[in-house]
Amino acid sequence: MSIKSSRHGGDVFGLSEEEQDKVFDFSININPLGLSPKGRAALLAHWEKETLRYPDVECRALKKSLSIRYGIPEESMALGNGATELMYKLLELLHPKKVIVPAPSFSEYRLSAEAAGCPVDSFFLKADQGFALPLEEIEKKLLRHSLIYLGHPNNPDGQMLSPSDFEAVLRLAKEKESFLIIDESFIDFVGDDVSYRHVLVNETCGAVVMSLTKFYAVPGLRIGAAYLHPALAERLQDTLIPWNVNGLAQSYMTAAAQDIDYIRNSRVYCQAEREKLSAAFDALDFVKVLPGSVNFILCRLIGRYQTAEELQEVLMPYHILIRQCGNYEGLDETYFRVAVRTEEENQILIKALGAVEN
């Protein structure tokens, strides 16, 4: 079995369907509990109707459900075919003079800026400093009429943006007539009270962009949300193509956003499994676990294996796929990331790592 690496992890689609079913894909950060029961029921009940008709171009039922779930007015949101579409459209709309992005971080921050024809610069989050935000460097690089991306939590290190750092960057954005985009695609794994969406919907210099496919486990359906000032939400919505959120995605998310038991259980489960995985990795003599707070773990090789590619090769007989992180700006080939999956799958990973330790 051979799997090519893509810019977002392993590409399993080059395998046969039979081989795909054998892979334990720890390179993708999706809720291990799978579909929301309420969302699944909605899909089963409405799949034929939603397939045979055009979706609601205004996403009315979904916006109402998300408004109830997250406490954000419907007029302060725009919905897209995943968070990535909204990032690209925001950059097209705002067209800042310069974009600065964290390194390491989600590659689409830089790519969305390049697609909009904007110059891009990086500021570095250093592992030996706990991936702390370098506020002095940001202040120097954030020019007037620029844009800054921040992850909260950041991918791949899982670090949260502290309230004091958020306030400092927001103040800089205001002073320099610039714009702040916070990517909260993994925030649901942490909790509602740590989000900054309630602040930025009242500001004209910022937005929260959020993938709904990670926590609600529907990457194949594709859906994302932007939370921002109503005037800007309207402008962003006008840039989106009609019917960009399909009917099945709308039906599923409308129900899943109200599945309170699923939301609570997912957080508890992922946190418990993360702690067990971290403890097991700490017991290995060739892996250093970096602290984080979300449903994935960033690690560094410190012994037997020189690169994550080498580790991936020895894990292939176990049908295990990890995320090699050498293509993240600011990380080298000793870094890799693993998602928190089911208890059974996590145990398979732990046993495999133990087997290749010696």
At which residue positions do the language-model features occur?
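N-terminal "arm"/small-domain region of PLP-dependent enzymes with the aminotransferase-like
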Residues: M1-R53, R144
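PLP-dependent aminotransferase-like
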Residues: S5, E92-L150
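PLP-dependent aminotransferase class I/II
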Residues: G34-S36, C205-L290
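Short loop-beta-helix segment that forms the pyridoxal 5′-phosphate
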Residues: S67-K89
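Short acidic capping loops at alpha-helix termini that bridge into adjacent secondary structure
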Residues: P73-M77, K98, E184, T204-C205
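Active-site phosphate-binding strand-loop segment of PLP-dependent enzymes
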Residues: D121, A127-D188
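PLP-dependent enzyme catalytic core of the Aspartate aminotransferase-like
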Residues: S164, P317-Y318, E329-N358
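Conserved PLP-binding catalytic core of the aspartate aminotransferase-like
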Residues: Q271, L284-Y318
